[in-house]
């Protein structure tokens, strides 16, 4: 099922929003504790040559530089998913999400992010959409292939209002069934996801 591509309207794209951005600090709208843990793992991937990792962010125009590596800019558009990871035959476009709730709200993934992951996978069979998820209080984390969660997301997105009970979020049990559990402190996801994909390619079954 493919839902509509609901991109922001043109008037919103031109809106001026002053933001402060620290080099290497990540998107201030996201939980830096989770992204810093992911960044540390990704730096190791780069250092050992197992993957090339690009940290992406929203488009903006620089207005002025400030002290301590920060600057103020104008936000031009909503950004793509957080990471682009090339490893072996696969190229992953990954979005990181952290929640402090006992269930993962599907609304955390925005329309433009879901649309980007859909288009990414449609372009090439080697392209893989991925969500890197953490529930902070429960100390749980998962790597979830977009194709395994997209049905939940589009069903919620295109469903009736008010949302039926239990359909607007995912429980840890559901994430255990559709995702790959990883360490919330040292989220080394690449080998396990590649093994899962390789097993499916050779046997037709998921590990």
Where do the PLM segments sit?
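A structural signal for short, well-ordered beta-strand segments and their strand-loop junctions
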Residues: 54-55, 93, 130-133
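Charged phosphate-binding loop/patch that engages nucleotide di/tri-phosphates or the phosphate backbone
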Residues: 2-16, 21, 170-207
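Short connector loops at helix/strand junctions that flank enzyme active sites
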Residues: 76-80, 87-91, 112, 124-126
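Acidic-basic catalytic patches of nuclease active cores, encompassing PD-(D/E)XK
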Residues: 1-74, 203-205
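Nucleic-acid nuclease catalytic cores
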Residues: 118-151
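Conserved catalytic cores of phosphodiester-cleaving nucleases, focusing on short active-site segments
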Residues: 83-85, 89-101
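Mg2+/Mn2+-dependent nuclease catalytic core
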Residues: 99-123
């Amino acid at each position: 099922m493919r839902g509509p591509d609901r991109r922001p309207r043109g008037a919103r794209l031109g809106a001026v929003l002053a933001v402060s951005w620290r080099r290497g600090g990540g998107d201030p709208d996201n939980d830096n504790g989770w992204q810093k843990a992911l960044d540390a793992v990704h730096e190791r991937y780069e250092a050992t040559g197992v993957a090339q990792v690009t940290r992406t962010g929203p488009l903006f125009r620089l207005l002025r530089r400030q002290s301590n590596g920060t600057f103020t800019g104008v936000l031009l558009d909503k950004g793509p998913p957080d990471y682009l990871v090339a490893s072996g035959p696969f190229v992953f476009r990954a979005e990181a999400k952290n929640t402090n709730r006992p269930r993962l709200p599907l609304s955390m993934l925005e329309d433009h992010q879901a649309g980007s992951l859909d288009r990414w996978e449609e372009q090439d069979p080697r392209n893989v959409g991925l969500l890197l998820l953490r529930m902070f209080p429960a100390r749980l984390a998962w790597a979830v292939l977009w194709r395994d969660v997209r049905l939940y997301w589009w069903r919620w997105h295109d469903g009736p209002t008010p949302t039926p009970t239990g359909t607007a979020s995912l429980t840890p049990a559901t994430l255990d069934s559709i995702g790959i559990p990883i360490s919330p402190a040292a989220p080394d996801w690449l080998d396990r996801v590649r093994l899962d994909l390789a097993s499916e390619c050779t046997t037709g079954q998921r590990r």
